[in-house]
Amino acid sequence: MEVCGFNELKLVGASCATIYIDMKHSSNDNLTYDIIIIGAGIIGLATARTLLIQHPNLKLLILEKESDIALHQTGRNSGVIHSGIYYKPKSLKALTCLEGYQLLLDYVKEKNIPYELCGKLIVATETKELDSLKTLYHKGIEHGLTEIKLITGEEAKQMEPNLTCLQAIWVPYTGIVNYKEVCKRFLLDIVSMGGQIKC
């Protein structure tokens, strides 16, 4: 079986953080890595980068089945930087979203990766949606998004002339970024810290 350029990949021994691999075409029959990460999308690359920052002596390998990084979901999405407004306040998902949001903004600023905090409008177009919109607004405030605003349909139309709604939440935290560019920078960081990738 061919896996990302390997003629054969066998797990010949594994412990909690060590995996031994046997590659038939390798001059070294027993390459050893502390960590092997499968997949070079944003999650695989971010995980690898974080591990190498926290444990600089790790021998780390990323295996990617494609010819390049970020060719699937990571490179084929709308690039939204999420605020976490829809998550249950104080839940693990909400807290990690807030933490990840700030880490991402800090990173793109540090690396001069283009991004835009363009904001978004969450709208109620029917009377029956107004209560849900207000509930979401209060959840957003509880979540720590103190700059969100509950605005009228007319105020929303001033922001977006093609929009017709009764009421809206303005979420200035939401942004966009090219996650493929973020991944390219992650990979440069990983390689500079001694990590390896095999595509």
Report residues per predicted region.
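N-terminal Rossmann-fold NAD(P) dinucleotide-binding loop
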Residues: 44
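Dinucleotide-binding Rossmann-like beta1-alpha1 core, especially the glycine-rich loop
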Residues: 79-155, 159, 165
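Helical element adjacent to the flavin cofactor pocket in flavoenzyme catalytic cores
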Residues: 172-199
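A short, basic/flexible loop-to-alpha-helix module at the beginning of a structural domain
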Residues: 20-32
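Glycine-rich FAD pyrophosphate-binding loop
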Residues: 53-73
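Beta1/beta-strand and adjacent pyrophosphate-binding region of the FAD-binding site
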Residues: 30-41
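N-terminal amphipathic/hydrophobic targeting modules at extreme N-termini
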Residues: 6-7, 11-12, 17
